[in-house]
Amino acid sequence: MNERPITMNDIRNRADEAGFASLRRRAFLLGSLSAVSAAAFPAAASANSLRLEMILRDPAAPVSGNPAGKLTMVTFLDYNCPWCKKTAVPMRDAVLKDGDIRVVYKDWPIITKDSVEGARLALAANYQGGYEIVHHALMAIKARRAEADEMRAAVRATGIDFARLESDLKSRETEINALIERNHEQAMSLQLTGTPAFIIGKFLVPGAIRSAEEFTSLFEKAREQV
């Protein structure tokens, strides 16, 4: 049976489904690490390496940390995810301290419809090199479920060229929506049930990482598997 492509309407509808957020696995300890392998992907094994390469190397995905870093970490996130917010600063601190981590951001807005607006704002900011500053501004919003207006105010407060951002939201709408759709498809291929989730080297970590020290420990474990 041929399945139609995932659309932005599908993502918005899923974000609005009652009870979906309750499926998120909130906190996983180091012992719950599982190696990313063919078994993690529902498609044929021959396609798995290509799919993982697209997750790691999607040219449109924002990248921070050390773009030439030898260890790649992918983070799936939602700007209305409370555990994503708690994870953001420890992750940033650990990445800065390490100096050799390439971070790939996967905006996966699944918790509320306003989460989609947050993702679109951050991705539009990437066209002027402002993804990371907008990312941290959105993560710093204290409201448990931030609305679109509150998100826009937080982005404006960063001092980013908001007129250009709005222009990019319109002119790059197709590219931005396509990236969010790809992120969603990739999350489904990994059988993720919610945010946050991480790929660190060869490990899939489906849940919150609570401290910079935990991130550092995971970096070390991932390097042992290279």
What residues fall within each predicted segment?
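N-terminal secretory signal peptides
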Residues: 1-23, 34-38
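The canonical Cys-X-X-Cys-His
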Residues: 81-85, 198-199
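N-terminal twin-arginine translocation
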Residues: 21-30, 36-52
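Short active-site neighborhood of thiol/selenol oxidoreductases, capturing the structured segment around
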Residues: 67-80
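Cysteine-centric redox/oxidoreductase cores and disulfide-bonded domains
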Residues: 109-195, 199-225
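Short N-terminal segments immediately surrounding and downstream of signal-peptide cleavage
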Residues: 48-64
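Loop/turn elements at helix/coil->beta-strand transitions in domains of secreted/extracellular proteins
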Residues: 72, 99-102, 129-132
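Typically the conserved alpha-helix immediately C-terminal to a functionally engaged Cys/Sec
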Residues: 85-97
